[in-house]
Amino acid sequence: MLFPLFLELEGRPCLVVGGGPVALRKAKALEDCGARVTVVAPEVCGRGFADADVEGMTLVLAATNDRALNRRVADLCRARGIPVNAVDDPANCTFVFPAVLRKGPMTVAVSSGGACPVAAKMVRDKVGRLMADDFVSEVGRLGREREQLKRDFPDPQARKRVCEEALRKWND
């Protein structure tokens, strides 16, 4: 079973093995989070994968059209305790890329654990339609006022009630 987790990747080294559309899309997603991404693929850097490429990486994505190579990358990473995702091969993944929605301060991630990524995208899109712009704005306001709310309502339960009341109209 996978544990849902949001991970800080700012400045962290990440490796993408493969140069096709899926690999490059996931490399961009990692870069968008501030990761230092290295892409290894003949069509990108003029050489193929070498075992040493995984050394020192925070996480690795194997996204080639060669399942044996993806499996080799996954095995190397597992042996070194490096989180790895082998695209379209859940058995060789220690993490998955969820379907992600970002609106203001809100981030929603939905995963089927690799069973059916299309279903995860459908749920993400449905949730996106439910998150009205004014709801997202109110969440942003509460976030900006969080320190003041902590001072005004030192009891966590009281603070929770204030936030719930501010957001109640979107939950009815």
Sequence positions of predicted segments:
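Hydrophobic, well-ordered beta-alpha structural blocks that scaffold small-molecule cofactor pockets
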Residues: 1-43
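Residue-level detector of alpha-helix initiation sites
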Residues: 21-22, 68, 114
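Glycine-rich, highly charged phosphate/nucleotide-binding loops
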Residues: 40-55
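Short, ordered loop/turn segments at secondary-structure junctions
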Residues: 42, 88-92, 113-114
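Short basic, glycine-rich beta-strand/loop surfaces that mediate nucleic-acid
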Residues: 58-64, 95-115
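ADP-ribose/adenylate-binding Rossmann-like module
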Residues: 59-64, 70-97
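An accessory alpha-helical subdomain
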Residues: 114-172
